[in-house]
């Protein structure tokens, strides 16, 4: 009976997730890609005007776009087709280090806010294939939830230079955490670190969500959560962010 019960529960969960996925796809999952490829890039190349993006860097291969959700949230996106964390391009050495580029783009938040925002209040996040609403690669540049900030501060000494479970997880979900220096983050993509250092991750990159947060000792913590349908975890690292930016109040 127990096995049957677990099987039925799994079926219900999978059906529910499929329903969520269908609902997401109904809202044009290519909207961001259309904005980047049909508006931002052509406008920059033809008129030297990045609108509706805030910035377009064709040679570097990325754009920065003001998201409509929240007063300070921005997105960093490639100028070419990459769907998301499942893309094999992200573990190729010639692919731009999008997380490092996104960290540089945090200055747009301060410009919008009208004064400098402390690095400790900023986070970067990308959702997994099951945890996203859009099928064009995008890193969320936004404020960090105050409770997540407090939890990361409490666990500062427990974060290793190896991928290890973060004590207590975050937002009710299990996370792996890894400490990196600013130099390491600048030189090596977090996607590469995850794929090369976590067993079996390379074959299942699309099931992972990733986040980057600055720590009080000036290091960075990389955070990764993997889809787990039985635990109701769709792997949406955006859950650690607060697009209303309570942390600044």
From Swiss-Prot:
Domain of life according to the entry: Bacteria
Example GO molecular function: CDP-diacylglycerol diphosphatase activity
Protein name (Swiss-Prot/TrEMBL): CDP-diacylglycerol pyrophosphatase
Subcellular location: Cell inner membrane
Alphabetical GO biological process terms: CDP-diacylglycerol catabolic process; phospholipid biosynthetic process
Annotated GO CC locations: plasma membrane
Cross-referenced HAMAP family: Cdh (MF_00319)
Record-listed E.C. numbers: 3.6.1.26
UniProt keyword annotations, A-Z: Cell inner membrane, Cell membrane, Hydrolase, Lipid biosynthesis, Lipid metabolism, Membrane, Phospholipid biosynthesis, Phospholipid metabolism, Transmembrane, Transmembrane helix
Catalytic activity: a CDP-1,2-diacyl-sn-glycerol + H2O = a 1,2-diacyl-sn-glycero-3-phosphate + CMP + 2 H(+)
Pathway: Phospholipid metabolism; CDP-diacylglycerol degradation; phosphatidate from CDP-diacylglycerol: step 1/1
Transmembrane segments: 7-27
Organism: Citrobacter koseri (strain ATCC BAA-895 / CDC 4225-83 / SGSC4696)
Pfam family membership, one: CDH
Membrane topology (UniProt): Single-pass membrane protein
Family: Belongs to the Cdh family.
InterPro entries with a match to the protein in the record: CDP-diacylglyc_Pase, CDP-diacylglyc_Pase_proteobac, HIT-like_sf
